[in-house]
Amino acid sequence: MSNLIEIKSKSTHTATVIFLHGLMDTGKGWETRMENIISMGGLDHIKFVLPTAPTIPISINFGNKGTAWCNVTAFYPGSEEDLIGLEKSMKLVEALIEEEIKNGIPAERIILSGFSQGGALTLYTGYQSKHKLAALITLSGFSPSLSLPSKIKPENKDIPLTMFHGTDDKVVNCKWGELSHKSYLKVGIKNSQFISITNLDHSSNEFELKQVHDLIEKYLPK
């Protein structure tokens, strides 16, 4: 995959975090924030992989091209879904997971995470993957498809899930994130939590990044 950012582990590599950016962004755009998380300590054994989405026409951007994991017509529940684009991007992420496994990192030592549309792809891939991952973490994420809950593989239902969302998010409303989480609870995703962050808009902050750090340290211990 082109434009792939890798932050190498500082000690022996025994675990990996794959982080997926949001619409019109790049893996490079999240590099500094991932380095901030690493600087909080305890993650020297972990490699961070930050891919960049393909460049495609985006309906919400008046058809102009930009980086996106799939086409977007609107950011609200029930908007038109680009399932073909989601499936293509899921294959890209699965290839990254399989590359880590090929290099000696078992699936249960890999966390998949993402922001906004990257969070949506995290859910879409993580719950349908043939590889049972260590955990899924989303920031300002949402369910990318109304049909996803019915597609979840039974063996993946106990993958730990944490969804963070800012209460002041004007792009992906916090209520959408909360409804997405509830839709997973209804199909048996019990090991999960939804955490709203007061006064946070469609972005991340130090408090949220510290929570992400603590989860990575929990699910990918040395």
From Swiss-Prot:
Q: Which domain of life is it from?
A: Eukaryota
Q: What molecular function terms (GO) are annotated for this protein?
A: carboxylic ester hydrolase activity; palmitoyl-(protein) hydrolase activity
Task: List GO terms (cellular component aspect).
Answer: cytoplasm; nucleus; phagocytic vesicle
Q: Which residues form the active site?
A: 116, 169, 202
An individual GO BP term:
fatty acid metabolic process
**What InterPro entries does this protein's entry cite?**
AB_hydrolase_fold (IPR029058), LYPA1-2/EST-like (IPR050565), PLipase/COase/thioEstase (IPR003140)
Q: Which UniProt keywords apply?
A: Cytoplasm, Fatty acid metabolism, Hydrolase, Lipid metabolism, Nucleus, Serine esterase
What enzyme category does the UniProt record give? hydrolase
The UniProt entry, under Gene3D superfamilies, shows: alpha/beta hydrolase (3.40.50.1820)
List locations, semicolon-separated: Cytoplasm; Nucleus
Q: Which reaction does it catalyse?
A: S-hexadecanoyl-L-cysteinyl-[protein] + H2O = L-cysteinyl-[protein] + hexadecanoate + H(+)
Q: What is its EC number?
A: 3.1.2.-, 3.1.2.22
What SUPFAM superfamilies does this protein map onto? Answer: alpha/beta-Hydrolases
Give the family, as the similarity comment puts it: Belongs to the AB hydrolase superfamily. AB hydrolase 2 family.
Function description: Hydrolyzes fatty acids from S-acylated cysteine residues in proteins with a strong preference for palmitoylated G-alpha proteins over other acyl substrates. Mediates the deacylation of G-alpha proteins such as GPA1 in vivo, but has weak or no activity toward palmitoylated Ras proteins. Has weak lysophospholipase activity in vitro; however such activity may not exist in vivo.
The name under which this protein is listed is Acyl-protein thioesterase 1 homolog 2
Source organism: Dictyostelium discoideum (Social amoeba)
Lineage start: Eukaryota, Amoebozoa, Evosea, Eumycetozoa, Dictyostelia
